[in-house]
């Protein structure tokens, strides 16, 4: 009879059941995903494996607490313990990135960017960001995104030969169009942006300079990648990806007036109650990034990405910009006559997860694309090094070579077992 009672009327013991018994369908999905992560090679550049401590914080009782407002200035009672977590996250972010101000409440990187726009722009203002096909992000002015609908969005690109940001084009466009805000950063750009020149261009044209370091925040935290924080008026980031925390966003600045405007934009302007369980997990991840070992991790991420890209290039694949300075690489599949979506499917069937990705000058639709993006952060977290990433490169080459040759290439059928064996040697902690 108890299974017919509404949840509120069910015996207290029923609500204490572990997921496996309380909801077998969802438990099976969660366990299947755990098994997939355990036994496959994860090369999606925006993904990583968090620690057990981050999982514990995110799955804690802090999910029960509403806490609109900021520490010490809440609109609900009973917030003294969640205030501890949020204050810790703020202070750790400030220490890690050397800034005066941090807002840790954005639910995502996209909402962090939206909060900056809400704080600093008016509808119809001009913004200037990296073109999506050149490695930019949807929230930097893509027409399908709010940023491309509410603002007059302009874009800059990359040099057609080097595939590096054409800073002269950025300057010409900024001087001609006078944008209110210039954005540096992206989701598939593998080189170090010239943050100092971006700021100089912004200053010369009366623009605000925003750096979106969502992809390389962990590398910045580990001292392996130049920091945009000293140059940007505002820096946004996610807390996952290379920072290896829970999925979420964060906003950093040294400007007190901008900080006040951002606080008001995040709450009450854009969001209501913060996700306190996620903020607690952010604090844990930021604390982990402050440990000496994280610097070695950040350096290893870049070394491994370079090893992977070099092996793919040796095997005949075209790497956009000729290599990488960070955790990701973009592979142009056009010389091999392959589509990104087909490559993504074939690799997933072999136990290797990537994502299809546009390449500079791509004529294919976003659902197809002419490239794939690969990343090293997740498998580096498992303990893999350059030798393993060269092996991964060999597996990718075998799959894509077989796809190019109509499935006839020798060795392709052996890839799933080899990928599973490599994963088995570097298990996850959960």
Swiss-Prot record:
GO terms for biological process: glycine biosynthetic process from serine; tetrahydrofolate interconversion. Its cofactor is pyridoxal 5'-phosphate. Keywords: Amino-acid biosynthesis, Cytoplasm, One-carbon metabolism, Pyridoxal phosphate, Transferase. The keyword Isomerase does not apply. GO terms for molecular function: glycine hydroxymethyltransferase activity; pyridoxal phosphate binding. The record marks 240 as: Plays an important role in substrate specificity. Belongs to the SHMT family. This is Serine hydroxymethyltransferase 1. It comes from Bordetella parapertussis (strain 12822 / ATCC BAA-587 / NCTC 13253).
């Amino acid at each position: 009879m108890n299974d017919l009672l509404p949840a509120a009327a069910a015996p207290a013991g029923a609500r204490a059941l572990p997921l496996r018994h309380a909801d077998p369908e969802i438990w099976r999905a969660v366990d299947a995903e755990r098994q997939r992560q355990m036994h496959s090679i994860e090369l999606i550049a925006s993904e990583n494996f968090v620690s057990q401590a981050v999982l514990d914080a995110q799955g804690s009782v802090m999910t029960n607490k509403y806490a609109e407002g900021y520490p010490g200035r809440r609109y609900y009672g009973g917030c003294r313990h969640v205030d501890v977590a949020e204050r810790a996250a703020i202070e750790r972010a400030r220490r890690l990135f050397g800034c005066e101000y941090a807002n840790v409440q954005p639910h995502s990187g996209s909402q962090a960017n939206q909060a900056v726009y809400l704080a600093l722009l008016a509808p119809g203002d001009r913004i200037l960001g990296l073109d999506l096909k050149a490695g930019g992000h949807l929230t930097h002015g893509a027409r399908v995104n709010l940023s491309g609908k509410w603002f007059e969005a302009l874009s800059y690109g990359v040099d057609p030969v080097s595939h590096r940001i054409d800073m002269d084009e950025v300057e010409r466009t900024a001087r001609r169009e006078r944008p209110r805000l210039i954005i540096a950063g992206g989701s598939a750009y593998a080189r170090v942006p010239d943050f100092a020149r971006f700021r100089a261009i912004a200053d010369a044209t009366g623009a605000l300079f925003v750096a979106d370091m969502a992809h390389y925040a962990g590398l910045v935290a580990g001292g392996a990648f130049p920091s945009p924080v000293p140059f940007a008026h505002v820096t946004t980031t996610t807390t996952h990806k290379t920072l290896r925390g829970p999925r979420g966003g964060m906003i950093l600045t040294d400007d007190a007036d901008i900080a006040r405007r951002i606080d008001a934009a995040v709450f009450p302007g854009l969001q209501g109650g913060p996700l306190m369980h996620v903020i607690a997990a952010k604090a844990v991840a930021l604390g982990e990034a402050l440990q000496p070992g994280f610097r070695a991790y950040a350096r290893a991420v870049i070394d491994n990405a370079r090893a992977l890209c070099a092996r793919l290039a040796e095997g005949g694949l075209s790497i956009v910009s000729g290599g990488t300075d960070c955790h990701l690489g973009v592979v142009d599949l056009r010389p091999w006559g392959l589509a990104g979506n087909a490559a993504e499917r074939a690799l997933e069937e072999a136990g290797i997860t990537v994502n299809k990705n546009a390449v500079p000058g791509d004529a294919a639709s976003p659902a197809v694309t002419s490239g794939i993006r690969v990343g090293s952060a997740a498998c580096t977290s498992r303990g893999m090094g350059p030798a393993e990433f060269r092996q991964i490169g060999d597996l990718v080459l075998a799959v894509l070579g077989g796809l190019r040759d109509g499935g006839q290439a020798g060795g392709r059928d052996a890839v799933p077992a080899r990928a599973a064996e490599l994963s088995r040697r570097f298990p996850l902690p959960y």
